[in-house]
């Protein structure tokens, strides 16, 4: 039996609170159960040096965890003097995922930075960051259009992500920490609104998984992500 008696295919209670902070062009507090991430989108004129003069924009991301977002305190990475490998991997994943949602040529020479700060971690922080940052990005792009800085919205569609895994032989969707830490197989899936996949990260933590189990996990992920898309659309309509 899962925590809170969730069904195998069920996503945790999901909340997307827009305009959570007043300064950023887009800001969203995303909550998947007890996992809470603040996602902000900042728009700046100009692009990185390698893109100058090409007439296209750029989307990048930063990810971090507050020291007490976990059960015991983790020192800030700034205090250590460098970011860890996990942090770098996650923020690159977030940026890749959100770049897939935008026509960078139509964005023009703007850079949008997505900051994802984990306030409380209970599994699935990277997938929650992607799903929340997508809504913050949509708000930032809408403001660029409304201000007249862009003629048309360059967003191609929504992006969402979810974790799936095999725990004690059972395929489960949207793992919380107690499940993730016991998973034989752990997978993160990122998808576009039209059903195309952006990224699949799968690892056999214990037993290797079969082709049939892979297909089962992908189907679970697609169902969970459809639920997230519905929540994103509902939030953006408010």
Swiss-Prot record:
Sequence similarity: Belongs to the RNase PH family.
Alphabetized PROSITE patterns for the sequence: RIBONUCLEASE_PH
Subunit architecture: Homohexameric ring arranged as a trimer of dimers.
Keyword tags: Nucleotidyltransferase, RNA-binding, rRNA processing, Transferase, tRNA processing, tRNA-binding
HAMAP family: RNase_PH
CDD domains (UniProt xref): RNase_PH_bact
Organism the protein comes from: Yersinia enterocolitica serotype O:8 / biotype 1B (strain NCTC 13174 / 8081)
Residues annotated to bind phosphate: 86, 124-126
MF GO annotations: 3'-5'-RNA exonuclease activity; tRNA binding; tRNA nucleotidyltransferase activity
InterPro entries: ExoRNase_PH_dom1, ExoRNase_PH_dom2, ExoRNase_PH_dom2_sf, PNPase/RNase_PH_dom_sf, Ribosomal_Su5_D2-typ_SF, RNase_PH, RNase_PH_bac-type, RNase_PH_CS
EC number per UniProt: 2.7.7.56
Catalytic activity: tRNA(n+1) + phosphate = tRNA(n) + a ribonucleoside 5'-diphosphate
Name the record gives this protein: Ribonuclease PH
A Pfam entry, by short name: RNase_PH
Protein task: Phosphorolytic 3'-5' exoribonuclease that plays an important role in tRNA 3'-end maturation. Removes nucleotide residues following the 3'-CCA terminus of tRNAs; can also add nucleotides to the ends of RNA molecules by using nucleoside diphosphates as substrates, but this may not be physiologically important. Probably plays a role in initiation of 16S rRNA degradation (leading to ribosome degradation) during starvation.
Keyword tRNA processing among record annotations: yes
GO terms of biological process kind: rRNA catabolic process; rRNA processing; tRNA processing
């Amino acid at each position: 039996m899962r925590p809170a008696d969730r069904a195998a295919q069920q996503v945790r209670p999901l909340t997307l609170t827009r305009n959570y902070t007043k300064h950023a062009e887009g800001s969203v507090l995303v909550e998947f159960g007890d996992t809470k991430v603040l996602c902000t989108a900042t728009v700046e004129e100009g692009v990185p040096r390698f893109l100058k003069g090409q007439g296209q924009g750029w989307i990048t991301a930063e990810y971090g965890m507050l020291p007490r977002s976990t059960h015991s305190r983790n020192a800030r990475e700034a205090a250590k003097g460098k970011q860890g490998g996990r942090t770098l991997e996650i923020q690159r994943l977030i940026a890749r995922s959100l770049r897939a949602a935008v026509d960078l040529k139509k964005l023009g020479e703007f850079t949008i930075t997505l900051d994802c700060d984990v306030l409380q971690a209970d599994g699935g922080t990277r997938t929650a960051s992607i799903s929340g940052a997508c809504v913050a990005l949509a708000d930032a792009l809408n403001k660029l259009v409304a201000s007249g800085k862009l003629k048309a919205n360059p967003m191609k569609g929504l992006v969402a992500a979810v974790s799936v895994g095999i725990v004690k032989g059972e395929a489960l969707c949207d793992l919380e920490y107690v499940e993730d830490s016991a998973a034989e197989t752990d997978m993160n899936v990122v998808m576009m609104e039209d059903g195309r996949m952006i990224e699949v990260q799968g690892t056999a933590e214990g037993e290797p998984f079969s082709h049939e189990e892979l297909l089962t996990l992908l189907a679970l992920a697609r169902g969970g992500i459809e639920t997230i898309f519905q929540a994103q659309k509902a939030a953006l309509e408010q």
